[in-house]
Amino acid sequence: MHSFEIFNRPWGFYKTVFLSEFVQAKIIQVFPKQQLSLQYHKKREEHWVIIKGQGMMTIGESTREVMEGGYIFIPKGCKHRIKNTSEKNPLIISEVQLGTYFGEDDIIRIEDDYNRV
């Protein structure tokens, strides 16, 4: 099996665990009290399962609490972000992307705590 690199980000890190022509799977870890940018993708949809922890998920105009075992569908073109609400524990997410392109340049950021817009 292929060993994939860990990619560090200001909010945590991710590791790609599977990649094919139309599917990419990642494990994402969000550090306590950190959040991903508010973003959308033009060329992929995402399916998330919360493996460990809890957070607040924004999809479109709605925000809701998510916790272990929760499933989130993010349609192509839909703005989204997740925040780890824990003071001390990581938020771990399994992410499956379906689409035609998985490059990091298909992340269109709207808001970002780390000045990456």
Language-model features and meaning:
Residues 2-9, 81-117:
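Double-stranded beta-helix
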Residues 2-40, 44-45:
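A short glycine-rich, His/Asp/Glu-containing loop-to-beta-strand
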Residues 32-34, 43-44, 62, 78-79, ...:
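A generic "binding-loop/recognition-motif" signal
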Residues 36, 62-64, 106:
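Short beta-strand segments
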Residues 37-38, 57-58, 74, 80-87, ...:
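Short beta-strand His + acidic residue motifs that chelate non-heme Fe in jelly-roll/DSBH
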Residues 43-56, 60-61:
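Glycine- and acidic-residue-biased ligand/ion/polar-headgroup-sensing regions
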Residues 61-79:
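Short acidic-glycine-tyrosine-enriched beta hairpin
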